[in-house]
Amino acid sequence: MASVAPKIAKDVTELIGNTPLVYLNKVAKDCVGHVAAKLEMMEPCSSVKDRIGYSMIADAEAKGLIKPGESVLIEPTSGNTGVGLAFTAAAKGYKLVITMPASMSIERRIILLAFGAELILTDPAKGMKGAVAKAEEILAKTPNGYMLQQFENPANPKIHYETTGPEIWKGSGGKVDGFVSGIGTGGT
């Protein structure tokens, strides 16, 4: 067990990243090599999507596209990206409007609302296309509105190039022979 006391973060976004790696000894018991997993459930909101929520907001800020207290962030989502955006938006002082199909879990809705996001549910029969269309409609009517566009935003996968990849490389001592990951928007 580590005996060094952690520093106190100035806000929750400083806790994103640097998640541990652990060997899966039982899974790889009869294997020649080692299998390790990156424990992204150790992120502040228990998801790898915390990284991309932060990355897309920080990138838009750095480009001067949004400002806390002025800009209204709008995003269609069906999953944890919305949670990552909601907690980052709350920490940084942004209003966030999330559109999502009404078929998404009540637990996810409660978390989004707890972080202060405005939640607009769309027809589940229209899937994500319906949520995207509703977000675009809201954007057109919202002064200072900005859509992060997780499906097209280079800051989404870029955070893994900048942080997750180097963390894996460093944590493994540069001994990575293979890598397995699920991919949706590229933010996983």
From Swiss-Prot:
The record ties this protein, via CDD domains, to: CBS_like (cd01561)
- Write down the required cofactor(s): pyridoxal 5'-phosphate
Q: Which residues carry this modification: N6-(pyridoxal phosphate)lysine?
A: 49
Q: GO cellular component annotations, sorted alphabetically?
A: cytosol
Database matches in InterPro entries: Cys_Synth/Cystath_Beta-Synth (IPR050214), P-phosphate_BS (IPR001216), TrpB-like_PALP (IPR001926), TrpB-like_PALP_sf (IPR036052)
Q: Which domain of life is it from?
A: Eukaryota
One matching Pfam family is PALP
- What are this entry's molecular-function GO terms? lyase activity; transferase activity
What's an example Gene Ontology biological process for this entry? response to zinc ion
Q: List where the protein spans the membrane.
A: none
Q: Where does this chain mainly localize?
A: cytoplasm
What keywords appear on the UniProt entry? Answer: Amino-acid biosynthesis, Cysteine biosynthesis, Cytoplasm, Lyase, Pyridoxal phosphate, Transferase
Q: Which Gene3D superfamilies match?
A: 3.40.50.1100
Where does the UniProt annotation locate this protein?
Cytoplasm
What does the entry list as the binding residues for pyridoxal 5'-phosphate?
80, 184-188
Query: Which protein family is it in?
Result: Belongs to the cysteine synthase/cystathionine beta-synthase family.
What PANTHER family does this protein's entry cite? Answer: CYSTATHIONINE BETA-SYNTHASE (PTHR10314)
- What name goes with this protein? Putative inactive cysteine synthase 2
What is the organism of origin for this protein? Arabidopsis thaliana (Mouse-ear cress)
